[in-house]
Amino acid sequence: MDQQRKNKEFIINYLTDISGIVKTRALAEKYMTDEVLIGQIEYFDAAFPRYEVYINELIAEGNLVVVRARFKGTHKGDLGGIPPTHKTVEYNFVIRYEIENGKIINHWLIADQMSLMEQLGVVPAAAASH
């Protein structure tokens, strides 16, 4: 099996393993050394416990895997000063993982934060469409 296929399978396994469960540091460290990403996972799991990730598309080249996916979770914890709304939200994101020696060592993420804020009621729906 070529390395790109292995990297894609690694990311599929990682996202499947973390989806819908409590995300512990030990679980994250099984897949990565990227401390920034570990922190983001812990932060979002505190705000949206047991959030789920649904993969829409994966592309691999060399040691990079790009994922277009959907986040789904219920807002039950503080999110940057936004108290829990108990609303279930879904938004799209794209993340690029850099893999080395069977671990994620770096990432780049872009997410539809406007949609997230609109769904939480922080930004009025009309403002989000402009």
Stretches found by the model and what they are:
Residues 1-130:
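C-terminal and inter-domain tail/linker signature
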